Amino acid sequence: MQSPLTIPVPVPVLRLPRGPDGFSRGFASDGRRTILRPEVGEGHIQDPPESQEQRARATLRERYLRSLLAMVGHPVSFTLHEGVHVTAQFGATDLDVANFYVSQLQTPIGVQAEALLRCSDIISYSFKL
């Protein structure tokens, strides 16, 4: 007589933060700790240009991601290559923001119930709040 097959129980994975050397996960084996720099005001004069640029890029990325969040469920007009204009109900984007999932895509040749628009094909988009 055979014993019943048991289904293995999934084990949750804990992803540790990056170690002090920047490559490993977890903590340094010799007990080293990285020292955090104190927070500095936004308009500090001694900030290197790289950190100012990084802060500006972070602000622009946050605005872009907030605009994507605001578009969900609203009609959006897209301008594609070759001057093609389409309108659709925005649904979602993938993790890499490489594709937009839309519904009721109105194209010059008809309406598509659901579609994926590649961001590399989009020149601009607009929507009303």
Curated annotation (Swiss-Prot):
<dbReference type="GO" id="GO:0000387">
    <property type="term" value="P:spliceosomal snRNP assembly"/>
</dbReference>
<dbReference type="GO" id="GO:0003723">
    <property type="term" value="F:RNA binding"/>
</dbReference>
<keyword id="KW-0507">mRNA processing</keyword>
<feature type="domain" description="SUZ-C">
    <location>
        <begin position="1"/>
        <end position="31"/>
    </location>
</feature>
<dbReference type="GO" id="GO:0032797">
    <property type="term" value="C:SMN complex"/>
</dbReference>
<dbReference type="GO" id="GO:0016604">
    <property type="term" value="C:nuclear body"/>
</dbReference>
<comment type="similarity">
    <text>Belongs to the gemin-7 family.</text>
</comment>
<keyword id="KW-0539">Nucleus</keyword>
<dbReference type="GO" id="GO:0097504">
    <property type="term" value="C:Gemini of Cajal bodies"/>
</dbReference>
<dbReference type="GO" id="GO:0005654">
    <property type="term" value="C:nucleoplasm"/>
</dbReference>
<keyword id="KW-0963">Cytoplasm</keyword>
<dbReference type="InterPro" id="IPR020338">
    <property type="entry name" value="SMN_gemin7"/>
</dbReference>
<dbReference type="InterPro" id="IPR024642">
    <property type="entry name" value="SUZ-C"/>
</dbReference>
<feature type="domain" description="Sm">
    <location>
        <begin position="63"/>
        <end position="129"/>
    </location>
</feature>
<keyword id="KW-0508">mRNA splicing</keyword>
<comment type="function">
    <text>The SMN complex catalyzes the assembly of small nuclear ribonucleoproteins (snRNPs), the building blocks of the spliceosome, and thereby plays an important role in the splicing of cellular pre-mRNAs. Most spliceosomal snRNPs contain a common set of Sm proteins SNRPB, SNRPD1, SNRPD2, SNRPD3, SNRPE, SNRPF and SNRPG that assemble in a heptameric protein ring on the Sm site of the small nuclear RNA to form the core snRNP (Sm core).</text>
</comment>
<dbReference type="GO" id="GO:0034719">
    <property type="term" value="C:SMN-Sm protein complex"/>
</dbReference>
<dbReference type="Pfam" id="PF11095">
    <property type="entry name" value="Gemin7"/>
</dbReference>
<protein>
    <recommendedName>
        <fullName>Gem-associated protein 7</fullName>
    </recommendedName>
</protein>
<comment type="subunit">
    <text>Part of the core SMN complex that contains SMN1, GEMIN2/SIP1, DDX20/GEMIN3, GEMIN4, GEMIN5, GEMIN6, GEMIN7, GEMIN8 and STRAP/UNRIP. Part of the SMN-Sm complex that contains SMN1, GEMIN2/SIP1, DDX20/GEMIN3, GEMIN4, GEMIN5, GEMIN6, GEMIN7, GEMIN8, STRAP/UNRIP and the Sm proteins SNRPB, SNRPD1, SNRPD2, SNRPD3, SNRPE, SNRPF and SNRPG. Interacts with GEMIN6; the interaction is direct. Interacts with STRAP/UNRIP; the interaction is direct. Interacts with GEMIN8; the interaction is direct. Interacts with SNRPB, SNRPD2, SNRPD3 and SNRPE; the interaction is direct.</text>
</comment>
<dbReference type="GO" id="GO:0005737">
    <property type="term" value="C:cytoplasm"/>
</dbReference>
<feature type="modified residue" description="N-acetylmethionine">
    <location>
        <position position="1"/>
    </location>
</feature>
<dbReference type="InterPro" id="IPR047575">
    <property type="entry name" value="Sm"/>
</dbReference>
<dbReference type="GO" id="GO:0005829">
    <property type="term" value="C:cytosol"/>
</dbReference>
<keyword id="KW-0007">Acetylation</keyword>
